[in-house]
Amino acid sequence: FQRNATEGLTCLDPAPRWAVWPGRGTICFGRSPKAARIVADIKDHTIRAIQHAEALGGWTTLPERDVFDVEYWVLEQAKLARSGPPLQLAGKIALVTGAASGIGLACAHELLSLGAVVGAVDVDPEVVHLMDSDAWVGIECDVAEDVAMAEAVKTVVRQYGGLDII
């Protein structure tokens, strides 16, 4: 950013958005499931374009300045300025027990409203279908059963990449 920036530009988050997982494939990262899906879509198109270019005789990256100009395009900067700051818990992953009703459900809704994704655990099978959101994974589980609870935690970690709030 420092080598190419002009006055008035807002530095984008420099964290990687996707990575190669040797022997497995690729992993995409984002502050929300929607953001990760957008990264996955761009990554898929980029990989296909590179493969087609290689098949046609070769591919090289753009010079750093050209990549910077694309990333820091005036309209992209305007969009970022309008979007405002991220929600307080954006990028956080929560696990809530008793999430099908009462206090557990209220806590899950509050965490969602603050930007977290929620692994919602309850003995009630309805927890699976309570929310139609990619920020919610409902898991039928009896928290008194250690093996089932360990599997619930693994499900959340596999789906969202970690666990920050219990």
Give the role of each language-model region:
Residues 88-119:
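Canonical Rossmann dinucleotide-binding motif of NAD(H)/NADP(H)-dependent dehydrogenases/reductases
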Residues 114-130:
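Conserved glycine-rich Rossmann-like NAD(P)H-binding loop of the short-chain dehydrogenase/reductase
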Residues 141-151:
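The beta1-alpha1 cofactor-binding region of Rossmann-like NAD(H)/NADP(H)-dependent oxidoreductases
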Residues 155-166:
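A glycine-rich helix->loop->beta "capping" turn
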